[in-house]
């Protein structure tokens, strides 16, 4: 996987080379593997860890684990405890906003160039079904974006099995999040119930779905380019007004 990861960076994310990177590490397998891969490539990195106290001692143990990982590797470690008191159905969305707001604060304060998160192919599949269930357009069916402003997701082409295999093959330890086994959230229900059924139907479901998301992204780009070309030819801006040429309405 290390060779594939290096090639992916060289071919698709070459702008990361020589940059200062803030790696977001929860302590789970995905983020610890991302940390390991990036650290082996000799980037200048720091690690950011959020503790939302949602699992009490387990959450504190995660923080200690990540802090110790950074000490062993002599990597700068940034940690923040969040005390959120919000309705259960809003926890994930609120936590996400708090998390990314803080990551961007660290980016500015410590002069990092990019924020790296450990989202992978399985996460993108789950996001597809979440958006599909809530009604969406083509944008919502393209999965998780590999690049979003300063946030980069280098593991997106890799599936969960590849990540776990790499961790086991390299004796990498990680923390298990017990909440992932519960079906309290829609994402967990999709991960634990829907996706296994789809894999039973087609053992190569994950790889096939990856191709589908790729094609949807390509189609979305073509559509956006067509719309932009149409606007550039038929729309005009004048005195804070947008004018549409009559020929465009025929």
Please place each PLM-identified region on the residue numbering.
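ATP/NTP-dependent adenylation/nucleotidyl-transfer catalytic domains that generate, transfer
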Residues: 185-250
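Core alpha/beta nucleotide-donor-binding catalytic domains of modification enzymes
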Residues: 1-195
């Amino acid at each position: 996987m290390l060779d594939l990861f290096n090639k992916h960076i060289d071919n698709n994310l070459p702008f990361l080379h020589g940059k200062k990177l803030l790696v977001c590490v929860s302590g789970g397998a995905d983020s610890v593997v991302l940390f390991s891969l990036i650290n082996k490539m000799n980037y200048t990195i720091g690690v950011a860890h959020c503790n939302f106290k949602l699992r009490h001692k387990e959450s504190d143990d995660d923080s200690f684990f990540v802090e110790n990982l950074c000490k062993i590797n002599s990597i700068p470690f940034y940690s923040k405890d969040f005390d959120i008191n919000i309705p259960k159905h809003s926890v994930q969305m609120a936590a996400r906003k708090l998390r990314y707001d803080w990551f961007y604060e660290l980016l500015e304060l410590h002069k990092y160039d990019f924020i790296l998160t450990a989202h992978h192919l399985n996460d993108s599949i789950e996001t597809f079904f979440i958006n599909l269930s809530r009604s969406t357009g083509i944008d919502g069916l393209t999965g998780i974006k590999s690049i979003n402003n300063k946030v980069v997701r280098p593991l997106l082409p890799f599936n969960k099995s590849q990540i776990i295999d790499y961790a086991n093959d390299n004796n990498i330890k990680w923390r298990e999040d017990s909440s992932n086994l519960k079906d309290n959230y829609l994402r967990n229900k999709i991960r634990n119930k829907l996706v296994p059924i789809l894999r039973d139907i087609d053992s190569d479901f994950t790889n096939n779905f990856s191709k589908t998301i790729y094609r949807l992204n390509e189609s979305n780009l073509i559509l956006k380019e067509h719309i932009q070309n149409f606007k550039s030819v038929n729309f005009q801006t004048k005195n804070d007004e947008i004018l549409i040429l009559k020929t465009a309405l025929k």
